[in-house]
Amino acid sequence: MHLFIGVSLRPLGHGIPAPYAVEDICTAKPRDIPVNPICIYRNPEKKPQERRGAGAGEGQDPGVHKPPASGSCPGPTRAFGRRSFLQAPGPTPRTMRRTSSCRPS
């Protein structure tokens, strides 16, 4: 009985395509891959870029600039003018920013 079931189901197994390993998922076609892969495309000829601000200003927030050396800058300036009464008291990073030219922009 087991032999009969095995022999009768064998032709059905030949009709199902067998999964095979794809060498490079980034060049394979979507139908060849059973899942949705994420490919990271890199150009091997291109050298990695150095981070901006590396050196003396390392570890600083890129949005914060140093004030001018003259010392005439009064400090952070408001980016959006006066605060309304609905805003929380005190400066927030969104409403306060430091400018390099000491002029509000």
UniProtKB/Swiss-Prot annotation:
Zinc recorded as keyword: no
Keywords: Blood coagulation, Hemostasis, Protease inhibitor, Secreted, Serine protease inhibitor, Signal
Record region (Disordered): 38-105
Function field: Most important serine protease inhibitor in plasma that regulates the blood coagulation cascade. AT-III inhibits thrombin, matriptase-3/TMPRSS7, as well as factors IXa, Xa and XIa. Its inhibitory activity is greatly enhanced in the presence of heparin.
Disulfide bond residue pairs: none
Tissue: Plasma.
Family assignment from sequence similarity: Belongs to the serpin family.
Subcellular location: Secreted, Extracellular space
Protein name (record): Antithrombin-III
Organism lineage string: Eukaryota, Metazoa, Chordata, Craniata, Vertebrata
One record GO biological process: blood coagulation
GO CC annotations, alphabetized: extracellular region
GO MF terms, alphabetically ordered: serine-type endopeptidase inhibitor activity
Signal peptide as annotated in the record: 1-17
Location, primary (coarse class): secreted
Assembly with partners or alone: Forms protease inhibiting heterodimer with TMPRSS7.
Biased composition (Basic and acidic residues): 43-53
